[in-house]
Amino acid sequence: MISPALLERVACPVCLESAGCPQCSAPAGHAACRDDYVRRVRCACGGPDKVRLEARAEAALVCPCCGASYALRRHDGYADLGPVRPVGEVTQYADHEFQERLGTTDAEPVLSARVKADMMRRMLAPGAGEVVLDLGCGAGKLALYAGRDGARAAGVDVAPFFLAGAAAAVDLVRGDLRRLPFRKGAFPSAYSLDVLEHLDEPGVLDVLVEARRTVGPGGRLFVYTHAMESSALARFQRAVNRLARRLGQAGLIDHEREALRKSDHLNAIRSHEHFEALCAEAGLEVAERRYYNVVFKAVVEDLGLRLYEQARRRKPRPPEATEGRSANSLRASVKPPGALAMAAARALTWVLKLDVVLFGGVRTGPFFGLLRPRGGVQEGPHA
């Protein structure tokens, strides 16, 4: 949806106000935004605010600085605020056919998705009425769940393939996380799940910088991602994965969806120290961290769930069943799990939470992190 509150928060993704501290202020005009955006937005003060958009018609917003026009797609439930020119590589998640192959439903998150969502809610701890920004919200499924318990969620994603339920209940924006189209301090908190691994190192830094600016000096940012490390416990997961591959070769399970989901991973975060350095360069610090050693997940979800899915897999739909249909309508046609399956998944979710309860202090690659803005931005190689 596009609420009046969202329209108060949005801004041009690429234009900065001229006013700032002595280090980031600049003459008015788009030239200073175009030529000096990166340096100014990474200023230790948090950078200038972004230029507010002006309404020119019911379905359009215009930037008074660069002149770009942005559409309000009210029928589809989102504001189209992506930069006119691409910032970097465009993920395949923005591809219509790729999204159709992934598929999704608006069923509540369960299993590892629920573990991540509940860790976000525990560590971020949004208050009643607080609006939380989902950075890389995908179809908007988690944003729907994050809006429970009195908090509200807004979502931004590079691909506008949103679930109908999310488009009706959540403020949604199509935008690039590397150039967030929001005013400074627009949201008190934000989260990013399974997103940073899809970016190269400059992209990770850009997202952290933009997130810091968007949550403001007193804000909070939760991330789930992974560094290129592993613990001794990861050997068990690798053994399960080897077994799963053999079962896949025998036609007993299907790896396609998981392979698709990870197919454009760049895995730029080399270690936890590397991530901390990127955070420091972006003006953030890691306030809390828990590791995710996926012992129970490997058995229950990576192996058991795939065996179950293969057993109940329906025959493929004929091509004419999807021809000429939008991505949103294709998503709506994906068969949701039944009540019994959901009850079993909820129960198994508690088993998967043991991975955090028992092994959350054992250093490994995947981790949950709570980040907060720090006093100043450290100079780094990307400055």
Predicted regions and their residues:
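Conserved N-terminal segment of class I S-adenosyl-L-methionine
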Residues: 2-179, 183, 191-193, 205-208, ...
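Short, charged, solvent-exposed linker or helix-capping segments at domain edges/interfaces
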Residues: 219, 378-383
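Short catalytic micro-motifs in class I SAM-dependent methyltransferases
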Residues: 194-198
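S-adenosyl-L-methionine-dependent methyltransferase catalytic module, highlighting the catalytic core
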Residues: 201-210, 214-216, 220-370
